[in-house]
Amino acid sequence: MFNTHKVEIEWGGRPLTLETGKIARQADGAVLATYGETAVLATVVSAKEPKPGQDFFPLTVNYQEKTYAAGKIPGGYFKREGRPSENETLVSRLIDRPIRPLFVDGYKNDTQVVITVLQHDLENNPDILSMVAASAALTISGVPFMGPISGARVGYIDGEYVLNPNIDEMPESKLDLVVAGTSEAVLMVESEAQELPEDVMLGAVMFGHKSFQPVIDAIIKLAEVAAKEPRDFQPEDLSELEAKVLAVVENDLREAYKITEKQARYAAVDAAKAKAKEHFFPEGVEETEMSAEQFATIFKHLQAKIVRWNILDTGNRIDGRDLSTVRPIVSEVGILPRTHGSALFTRGETQAIVVATLGTGEDEQMIDALTGTYKESFMLHYNFPPYSVGETGRMGSPGRREIGHGKLAWRAIHPMLPAAEQFPYTIRAVSEITESNGSSSMATVCGTSLALMDAGVPIVRPVAGIAMGLIKEGERFAVLSDILGDEDYLGDMDFKVAGTEFGITSLQMDIKIDGITEEIMKVALEQAKGGRVHILGEMAKAISSSRAELGEFAPRIEVMNIPTDKIRDVIGSGGKVIREIVEKTGAKINIEDDGTVKIASSNGKEIEAAKKWIHSIVAEPEVGEIYEGTVVKTADFGAFVNFFGPRDGLVHISQLAADRVAKTTDVVKEGQKVWVKLMGFDERGKVRLSMKVVDQETGKEIVAEKKKEEVDAE
């Protein structure tokens, strides 16, 4: 019934298996991939024909994690998986980025790649395996995909590169780098690093590229026995039509791309396009040399050609800069004084308002992952409203791009955050992109660094980011610093580097062509370093280190530790005690399993009141100390006084006053505040208190006062 094919190799010390022919046989391509005991299913389906009028390639990648893969049942009312998590969105993008440029130009059939995590061994992260499985499924599907590709994770532990470190090893690693590519070239890099130098980062990229070659060989081996017949697709030859359009629009486009202001430049390009349309689609003529879709494709291609020729021939860019110059920068902090920390970062026509907000443990994000539930105390959210590019558009929940850009900035900042013991706050940074003309994610990095310093978050060092680009024709190439939106769209590489003056904290690279050598990447990294240091210098004009104090409106958090066996006393039955403390003092309280107690409030008196209350619950009263208490009950033989948190003690009638007392209620009443001295404990452990040795007005010991008076008299 099944015509199965399987390839198995040893990779990174674990078995990797690729199997097809048994599951999802109606898909164009389907591969079950297993690494260790983690298993994923990748499927590919591509429409037989493009939709009429389609002028782009509609590729969708969906990575989905099923909770059954880790032996779990989803939470929530419906008990089933819902909308994609942030991690699922990020992994979908991670797979999309290296496979998209490998589809043949002109292929516009609706294509969907679905990767499902079926089993997770809690050791091997399924993201790399999913990339491998998707590549294998595409390679055997018959669609015009110029792969295969593979990917690898590279760690850096004790000065050595580690291939595909398992989940338990990652906390020891100074690097979390994912690299993907073909047998000849690197196509994609995504990473977070602990201030590593450029040569270590480049070495990791090349180590990963070399390490995944056996996987590419395994995919080719599988395709040799299991691949479907390639689809009969021939890219349309538009060279003759392109030459005709070029003759009409070249001068207009060259003039348009000399305009430095973005909106004016776009208007000039639109005018050139409209003029060419009039020429090739005269009014009233039904039969034309080309279709509207062909014209749109050609015009986009010519835009790229004009810009690229100009840069390579003259070294001058669209806005008049040379290759390595960064646009003018203005940094401001404290622009929203009621917030905890704020910054406005402007670089050319790209601008971000970033606001930092500090919270308590209650504000931490709960993340329910396949590996278990954990809390995240640092959140960075990136918003890209349509007005930032002068357009109208959809508003609402963040899209894949916004989630991806936010995570890139998060990776850049995260290594520089203080330890929780040093700074026990939950931090949320929100970047509102108010203008965009290239590299808004790197503006977010710079703005977040400024806003955190303005908020008084003691980051290790300021972080800046820069986006690099590449134009390559044959042996000629130009590396561009701080690229514009057009240079990103029309170029061959998007290369984002963030870090401090001492090293890289995040690197993201997307390459659209083959032939990007190690030498070119080295040039780009060195040029990026110069740009990053320049940007840090510009940022320092606004603020160079974290403020010594938190903002006026930020909450204060103090930390105290209590014995773990006292946690239940502080919480109380059903949370009764801790709720009372919160209600009476107004402070927020978070108690962790190890006995760490975080008390937060914007009012210092509330924090002190809560600390004092908790201390009274967990501490033991000391014999000979004087305490303030409240009479809770009277009896013939004395009064019971609550004096130390939940503790009560007896003041015997003989200890109520210096003179003889006939009746307890002659001296005290229930609810009365009194001063008592702890005299000791009886043979049954009951507390013995005395009021008569304490001045009820001052709370000072009477005997001690008399002795002091005697000493003073002498």
From Swiss-Prot:
The record's subcellular locations are:
Cytoplasm
Residues bound to Mg(2+) are: 488, 494
The EC designation for this entry is 2.7.7.8
Database matches in InterPro entries: ExoRNase_PH_dom1, ExoRNase_PH_dom2, ExoRNase_PH_dom2_sf, KH_dom, KH_dom_type_1, KH_dom_type_1_sf, NA-bd_OB-fold, PNPase
Q: Which keywords annotate this record?
A: Cytoplasm, Magnesium, Metal-binding, Nucleotidyltransferase, RNA-binding, Transferase
Q: Where is the KH domain?
A: 555-614
Return the broad EC class. transferase
**The keyword RNA-binding is annotated on this UniProt entry:** yes
What do the Gene Ontology cellular component annotations say? cytosol
Q: Does the keyword Transferase apply?
A: yes
CDD domains reported for this sequence: KH-I_PNPase, RNase_PH_PNPase_1, RNase_PH_PNPase_2, S1_PNPase
Q: List each copy of the S1 motif domain by range.
A: 624-692
Q: Which SUPFAM superfamilies match?
A: Eukaryotic type KH-domain (KH-domain type I), Nucleic acid-binding proteins, Ribonuclease PH domain 2-like, Ribosomal protein S5 domain 2-like
This protein's cofactor list reads: Mg(2+)
What is the reaction catalyzed?
RNA(n+1) + phosphate = RNA(n) + a ribonucleoside 5'-diphosphate
Gene Ontology MF, one: magnesium ion binding
Its BP terms in the Gene Ontology are: mRNA catabolic process; RNA processing
List the HAMAP family hit by this protein, alphabetically. Answer: PNPase
Q: NCBIfam families attached here? A: polynuc_phos (TIGR03591), PRK11824.1 (NF008805)
The record's PANTHER family line, in alphabetical order, gives: POLYRIBONUCLEOTIDE NUCLEOTIDYLTRANSFERASE (PTHR11252), POLYRIBONUCLEOTIDE NUCLEOTIDYLTRANSFERASE 1, MITOCHONDRIAL (PTHR11252:SF0)
Q: Which family does it belong to?
A: Belongs to the polyribonucleotide nucleotidyltransferase family.
Explain the purpose of this protein. Answer: Involved in mRNA degradation. Catalyzes the phosphorolysis of single-stranded polyribonucleotides processively in the 3'- to 5'-direction.
Spell out the protein name for this chain: Polyribonucleotide nucleotidyltransferase
Q: Please tell me the species this chain comes from.
A: Brucella suis biovar 1 (strain 1330)
Q: Tell me the lineage of the source organism.
A: Bacteria, Pseudomonadati, Pseudomonadota, Alphaproteobacteria, Hyphomicrobiales
This protein's encoding gene: pnp
